[in-house]
């Protein structure tokens, strides 16, 4: 039973460290520096979210950006 508790704790630590699970909140200038743009409430179709510009604005960038 202790092994299950340990495995569960390790799993939670791994999920917290996963960079894709949370969006970085920043300034619009940070978004532009990353090659993105701010969009209110959602990103247009075919465009992915890469962060947050503010509470209601997402930082969006083309999936084909290199």
Swiss-Prot record:
<feature type="propeptide">
    <location>
        <begin position="20"/>
        <end position="25"/>
    </location>
</feature>
<feature type="signal peptide">
    <location>
        <begin position="1"/>
        <end position="19"/>
    </location>
</feature>
<feature type="disulfide bond">
    <location>
        <begin position="43"/>
        <end position="60"/>
    </location>
</feature>
<comment type="similarity">
    <text>Belongs to the beta-defensin family.</text>
</comment>
<dbReference type="GO" id="GO:0042742">
    <property type="term" value="P:defense response to bacterium"/>
</dbReference>
<feature type="disulfide bond">
    <location>
        <begin position="31"/>
        <end position="59"/>
    </location>
</feature>
<dbReference type="InterPro" id="IPR001855">
    <property type="entry name" value="Defensin_beta-like"/>
</dbReference>
<keyword id="KW-0044">Antibiotic</keyword>
<dbReference type="GO" id="GO:0060326">
    <property type="term" value="P:cell chemotaxis"/>
</dbReference>
<keyword id="KW-0964">Secreted</keyword>
<keyword id="KW-0929">Antimicrobial</keyword>
<dbReference type="Pfam" id="PF00711">
    <property type="entry name" value="Defensin_beta"/>
</dbReference>
<feature type="disulfide bond">
    <location>
        <begin position="38"/>
        <end position="53"/>
    </location>
</feature>
<keyword id="KW-1015">Disulfide bond</keyword>
<dbReference type="GO" id="GO:0031731">
    <property type="term" value="F:CCR6 chemokine receptor binding"/>
</dbReference>
<comment type="function">
    <text>Has bactericidal activity.</text>
</comment>
<dbReference type="GO" id="GO:0042056">
    <property type="term" value="F:chemoattractant activity"/>
</dbReference>
<keyword id="KW-0211">Defensin</keyword>
<dbReference type="GO" id="GO:0005615">
    <property type="term" value="C:extracellular space"/>
</dbReference>
<protein>
    <recommendedName>
        <fullName>Gallinacin-5</fullName>
    </recommendedName>
</protein>
<keyword id="KW-0732">Signal</keyword>
